[in-house]
Swiss-Prot record:
Keywords: Ribonucleoprotein, Ribosomal protein. GO terms for cellular component: cytoplasm; small ribosomal subunit. The keyword RNA-binding does not apply. Gene3D superfamilies: 3.30.1320.10. InterPro entries: Ribosomal_bS16, Ribosomal_bS16_CS, Ribosomal_bS16_dom_sf. PROSITE patterns: RIBOSOMAL_S16 (PS00732). Pfam families: Ribosomal_S16. This is Small ribosomal subunit protein bS16. Residues 89-130 have a biased composition (Basic and acidic residues). It comes from the Bacteria. Residues 131-157 have a biased composition (Low complexity). GO terms for molecular function: structural constituent of ribosome.
Length: 165
């Protein structure tokens, strides 16, 4: 199968690519059939020499069945040679199995923590309510005990007056 792809050249940290037609089994920078263009990523994006293509030669190879790689297809689409569509791979961005398991565990721990906080808050509210109820009962109980105590001396006072008189 024939591919139209990039073959890297240039020095370390200074890439320069040749756009070549090559067998898909040959190495990236190895043997190729024909050089059909160049790509220099170091030049500015609006520079005319950033991508140079031999359009007639590329059209011939496309007719013969050569398949462009994604990056080369973008260059060819810019020249109007092929219709390039953005590939959509929603699976690529998803985390792996282990990461999903860790996320599930973290979510479960967070849920348990929130539940524990809610339980603790409810227990604190119940304790407060019980303490308030006990305080109210304690306040009501002495008031009830004191009220008959006040009446009793008042009842004794007339009895004492009657005994004296």
């Amino acid at each position: 199968m024939l591919k139209i792809r990039l073959a890297r050249g240039g020095a370390k940290k200074r890439p320069y690519y040749s756009i070549v037609v090559a067998d898909s089994h040959s190495p990236r920078d190895g043997r190729f059939i024909e050089k059909v263009g160049t790509y220099n990523p170091l030049l500015k994006k609006d520079d005319a020499n950033r991508v140079t293509l031999k359009v007639e030669s590329i059209q011939e190879w496309l007719k013969k069945g050569a398949q462009p790689t994604d990056r080369v297809a973008r260059f060819l689409a810019a020249q109007g040679l092929v219709a390039w569509t953005h590939g959509n791979n929603p699976e690529k961005g998803k985390p792996g199995k282990k990461a999903q398991e860790r996320l599930a565990e973290r979510a479960q721990r967070e849920e348990e923590r929130k539940q524990a906080e809610a339980d603790a808050k409810a227990a604190a509210e119940a304790e407060k309510a019980a303490a308030a109820e006990a305080a109210a009962a304690a306040a009501a109980a002495p008031a009830v005990e004191e009220a008959p105590a006040e009446e009793a001396p008042a009842a004794e006072a007339p009895a004492e007056e009657a005994a004296e008189g």
